[in-house]
Amino acid sequence: METKISCKEATLADNASDILKSTTADNILTVPEEGITVTGILIGGQPQGVEWNFEPASSATFDHTIYDQEMNNGIAAKKSVTDPNYTLVLDNKNSSTADPKQSMVYVTVELENNMGDFYGAEGLIPKGSRFYLVGQLDPNASTATKPSGDPIDRVFVKDHTTVANFTITSLKKAYNHIPDLRTSKINVGLAVDLSWQKGITFDVEL
């Protein structure tokens, strides 16, 4: 998977008004010139193993997560788009005859708060700590661009590169802990533009 991340604006609003339940206005944080440091990417929806052809078995469950902490060139989220980061993932083809629907995939971007204290989805995220924003990759979304003539029906396809362009639109849905990517009850805080190079590209707002 090829991942790029940027901020929609040079300032980002937090979730203070909702968390504090008062007349307090949301805090507006300025994105540092060097950007918000990206320290990792977590990719859900992975099978526990694959067959000889590198496709999941018909009995496979897709509840495993890849945690990639090797970020290319120390990427950071800012107004301009970052250099891409690459993560090797497994095909997530669902071959089950009982429920053949191809699943969406949740991806979490891990960042270091180098801006200042702010309020996320569940509470305070202090300066210097790590926080997490989640994006949803849906192969059937209108923001998913598929190669012409290539019948792609899932997020990850062997011999293809899935391209996910994440955009941070606010800090309101930021977590102060790693969220469980196996549940659908999750705050999606990234906008995604998805496409494939012989695969998919996602443009996702966070």
Where are these regions (language model features)?
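Intrinsically disordered, low-complexity repeat and linker tracts
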Residues: 156, 165-206
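Tryptophan-paired
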Residues: 1-158, 202-206
